């Protein structure tokens, strides 16, 4: 077992009840183009077309052969594009339950399936996009290989669902999904889970993690078990997608069900909700928030994105919905107040005198932008064997060669989310990291 000692358990109010409830009926779903880094789509549909669940919507010009399929049957309602014609979302008005039938196999034969057969079925169904690479956090090429595949079956994000609760309802499908994954690599499949978690391992190698967040991030697991580099690529996948893999191969259907945690200080009844991938956030959170001036976030409060406009839909890789108050009110002389109701990692406020207290946090950054100030905050929350202050400095200054030498290729935006949270300078280090990774990949 690997214990993570550095990190942060964010004391935020609104933790969800770990019981799964049925969510509201979803009338609109969307595939979000900007979630797929570097995507240049070749559209196979147009507005007004009728589609079946699992039908191809578009393919990627830059990653030939990768297919993106419909998350529900219905009618193409919108194809939204942003600046420079970047695809933002393809919205489907849900109608009926027509679905494309895919190849299915006996569960006891999954261990012996031909690797190319497995790839073809995943690609045709669109589930290939559930896999992501390190370095670069992109959907792998259809002919790519991985030194190992990591299954993230532990979640330490604030307000997250317990994977054990979700997997308990699909243990056989999860085990079958692990068998499918094993056919994709000559290396090992690593099942990363919490200490003592009751999760079937099938033929995967179990690696247990304990400790503070980010003990549940794929980047943490990869760094400690099989580090990625310019010469070694590994893949990772979420536990609910592993369940979908198992159902695809044994039932021949594309399962787009997703259990998400709805939580946060402004959530009316924090709990786990069964919904679908790409669900409209307006429909999913209807009657779920308290009061006005609320921000709905797809994903974690640390690394999620605001669900608004053409992107107001549940993200492909997100397993929670966070609800916070918009922190747009300024507090006169707030810096001089005792702050008994405020949290600070540096113990600047008296809130630290109540270590078990949960805080009604808002979206406020607690001040304006300023210079980067290295006072030890980054080292407190970074459990990886890197020099965070030096790495972040190189990212801000544009010294990407230096950033790579310090370990940038191992990281994703979510791995630097805690550094962003504790930064006195209010920098979003994730965006600087993405600029670095894009530049390194482009220039080789």
Curated annotation (Swiss-Prot):
Keyword vocabulary terms for this entry: Ion transport, NAD, Sodium, Sodium transport, Translocase, Transport, Ubiquinone
Biological processes, Gene Ontology terms: sodium ion transport
Keyword Ion transport: yes
Enzyme Commission number, as recorded: 7.2.1.1
GO molecular function (one): oxidoreductase activity, acting on NAD(P)H, quinone or similar compound as acceptor
Role, per record: NQR complex catalyzes the reduction of ubiquinone-1 to ubiquinol by two successive reactions, coupled with the transport of Na(+) ions from the cytoplasm to the periplasm. NqrA to NqrE are probably involved in the second step, the conversion of ubisemiquinone to ubiquinol.
Designated name of the protein: Na(+)-translocating NADH-quinone reductase subunit A
Underlying gene: nqrA
């Amino acid at each position: 077992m690997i214990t993570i000692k550095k990190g942060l358990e964010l004391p935020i109010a609104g933790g969800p009840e770990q019981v799964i409830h049925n969510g509201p009926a979803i009338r609109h779903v969307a595939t979000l183009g900007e979630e797929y880094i570097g995507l240049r789509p070749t559209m196979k549909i147009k507005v007004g077309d009728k589609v079946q669940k699992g039908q191809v919507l578009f393919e990627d010009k830059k990653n030939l052969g990768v297919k993106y399929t419909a998350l529900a049957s219905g009618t193409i309602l919108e194809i939204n594009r942003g600046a420079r014609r970047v695809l933002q979302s393809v919205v489907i008005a849900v109608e009926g339950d027509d679905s494309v039938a895919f190849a299915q196999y006996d569960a006891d034969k999954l261990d012996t399936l031909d690797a190319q057969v497995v790839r073809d079925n995943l690609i045709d169904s669109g589930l290939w996009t559930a896999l992501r690479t390190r370095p670069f956090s992109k959907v792998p090429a259809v002919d790519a290989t991985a030194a190992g595949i990591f299954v993230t079956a532990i979640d330490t994000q604030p307000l997250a669902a317990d994977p054990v609760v979700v997997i308990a309802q699909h243990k056989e499908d999860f085990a079958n999904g692990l068998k499918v994954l094993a056919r994709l690599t000559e290396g090992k499949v690593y099942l990363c889970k919490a200490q003592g978690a009751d999760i079937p391992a099938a033929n995967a190698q179990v690696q247990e993690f304990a400790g503070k967040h980010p003990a549940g991030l794929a980047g943490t697991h990869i760094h400690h078990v099989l580090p990625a580099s310019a010469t070694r690529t590994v893949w990772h996948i979420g536990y609910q997608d592993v369940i979908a893999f198992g159902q695809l191969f044994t039932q021949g259907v594309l399962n787009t069900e997703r259990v998400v945690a709805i939580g946060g200080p402004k959530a009316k009844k924090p709990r786990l909700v069964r919904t679908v991938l790409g669900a409209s956030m307006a429909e999913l959170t209807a009657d779920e928030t308290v009061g006005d001036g609320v921000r709905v976030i797809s994903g974690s409060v640390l690394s999620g994105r605001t669900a608004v406009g053409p992107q107001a839909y549940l993200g492909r890789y997100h397993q929670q919905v966070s609800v916070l108050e918009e922190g747009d009110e300024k507090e006169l002389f707030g810096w001089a107040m005792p702050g008994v109701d405020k949290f600070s990692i540096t113990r600047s406020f008296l809130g630290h005198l109540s270590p078990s207290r949960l805080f009604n946090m808002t979206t406020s950054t607690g001040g304006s932008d300023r210079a980067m100030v290295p006072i030890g905050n980054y080292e407190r929350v970074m459990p990886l064997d890197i020099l965070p202050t030096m790495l972040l400095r190189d990212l801000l200054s544009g010294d990407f060669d230096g950033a790579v030498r310090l370990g940038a290729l191992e990281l994703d935006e979510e791995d630097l989310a805690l550094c962003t949270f504790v930064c006195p300078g209010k920098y979003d280090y994730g965006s600087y990291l993405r600029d670095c990774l894009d530049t390194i990949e482009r220039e080789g």
